[in-house]
Amino acid sequence: MGKIHELDSVLADQIAAGEVIERPASIVKELAENSLDANSHRIDIIVEEAGLKSVRVIDDGQGIEADDVARAFLRHATSKIADKGDLFKVTTMGFRGEALPSIASVADVLLTTATGGAAGSQIHIKGGEILAHGQASARPGTDILVSDLFYNTPARLKYLKSPHTELARIVDIVNRLALANPTVAFSLTHDGKEVFRSAGNGNLKQVVAAIYGVQAGRKMVEVKGEDPNFKVSGLVSLPELTRAGRQYMTIMINHRYVRNFQLTKALVAGYRSKLMVGRYPLAVINIDLDPVLVDVNVHPAKREVRLSMEPQLVDLLERVVSQAIDQQNLIPDVGDRADELLTREQTVHAPRSAAPRVSERASDEPPAWQPSPTSGEPVIISRRSELASPAVQAFDRRYQNEEVATPFGAQADAKVSQAQPAVEQVSLDIDDRGDVASERFPDLTYLGQLHGTYLLAQASDGLYIVDQHAAQERINYEYYREEIGKVSADQQNFLTPLVLNYSLADALKIQQHQAVLAACGLKLEPFGQNSFMLASHPTWFVAGQEEDTAREMIDWVLASGKLSVKDFRAKAAIMMSCKRAIKANHRLDERQAKALLARLPQCENPFNCPHGRPVTIHFTTTDLEKLFKRIQESHQPFADDFDDHED
């Protein structure tokens, strides 16, 4: 007798559930996507004990025909595709017919549905077996209750995390769905308390504000662009609003949230050098394309897709993000922080030993005003905005530990630069490089220097504070970016050629990238086994640091493995600009300071240093008047901040 036999349908469904239904958040995702496919305008999600006890999803969609209710729980039964051709042009969220039978095989499911023109139907299934099926009173749409998850597979329960973690995963799923479908009203209720609600009015900024906070919504910029195959639209944050991880970037393909490293990388690349190292923007990007160009049938949970013409899409995404950011005035304005302090402040007297309290918005965010250490001095305490809804407040707390890279968060280098003449570090030659950004950068009048680190200047619209190190670093960066690569005429010989020794593996990598190194001025010649000789170096190398600079550039190639000439030159320019820039606590005379301010507007990007830190922050005249309480501020309704329509 043969050893191979066919598994029964219940066991097969349980095996399939292992891939599709990993945790309560998986149930929320699958059921909510079914509701979206049913053209629902409202989807209410109710969970108890983080979904470990029950998950309920109610929608106002098309409902299920009475004859199809039981059939919907058969494996691979679906209304969304009919033949093999449909599999390559999927336009719905689901299409495999796996979700409902997988859920029903490991849980207790009660489904009630109606199509509007007929009597409702109800079915009760547990462990894959139908317990009851018949007519029921129901409003149009579908109401499905899932309870006792994994009751018959207790081993699966061991791999679930704490209720807090499981709830966080559900919240993340609902957030992504709401961002992908701003025209659908979502609500999420946990243990009887509503924690999220979106209006479903199509205003994406309002959804962002409900999830990430009102200030985040205000700092989002619209992006839009297309080519013959792709259409990109959505919102990205200004460079001053960042997070420590990539998880706040939501990228959708035809309104389906997906994970794609190349697209995420392109989105970040669109900011060029405007982001600080290790910081990432908030973004909500949707890419509309012909379904033929994307294969969504490559991952059990459909989180990953395979794209045709991906390089073309990567270029388009990077370009539209870059264009959107370049059109903005990127000088951080302190108006939002001043408004927050003056319209919702509460002044208390703190003893000398008390630690200064800061806004609840971010536990690690520095306060706008540092309190005096002397006893009895006022400490500013910001309160939660009364304009935000309870749902917005709840989700602000959800993200309260994330930093916002405001101008007050930029810390100057505390080390004192030892005396080198400032005139050697600040070039007084003002070259004519054009004024690409001059229209967006103000005409500044120099006032003075603060702490040997910041330059104070004024313009017609208020006070500007310029970080002198960041300013010259930006000027140097754009100079070196152009100079690196002009190797034929700008080489200087070493008195004694350098001999660089490496391991066999590293030597092979260097040989592979010799062309990149040569294009940037490092002409390495083989010199024995696993060794190279360097006879000359570019003239832009810092005097006395030629060998260190050469080794550092080679180390970049070894670390990256794959590096284009463009990327290599950018990295080298960043290194050189930082090494030759004036440091904090370095005194400049008036002539040197004015020369620095005069060169800054000539930069292609005068707003950020190459590492992404802001060069300048701005106090408008209105901000100053508010700080001194010379004017009062009126409150505006929360929704008005993100209303795209005029009255």
UniProtKB/Swiss-Prot annotation:
The keyword DNA repair applies. CDD domains: HATPase_MutL-MLH-PMS-like, MutL_Trans. Keywords: DNA damage, DNA repair. Residues 346-378 are annotated as: Disordered. The keyword DNA repair applies. GO terms for biological process: mismatch repair. It comes from the Bacteria. Pfam families: DNA_mis_repair (PF01119), HATPase_c_3 (PF13589), MutL_C (PF08676). One of its GO terms (molecular function) is ATP hydrolysis activity. One of its GO terms (cellular component) is mismatch repair complex. This protein is involved in the repair of mismatches in DNA. It is required for dam-dependent methyl-directed DNA mismatch repair. May act as a 'molecular matchmaker', a protein that promotes the formation of a stable complex between two or more DNA-binding proteins in an ATP-dependent manner without itself being part of a final effector complex. NCBIfam families: mutl, PRK00095.1-3. Belongs to the DNA mismatch repair MutL/HexB family. This is DNA mismatch repair protein MutL.
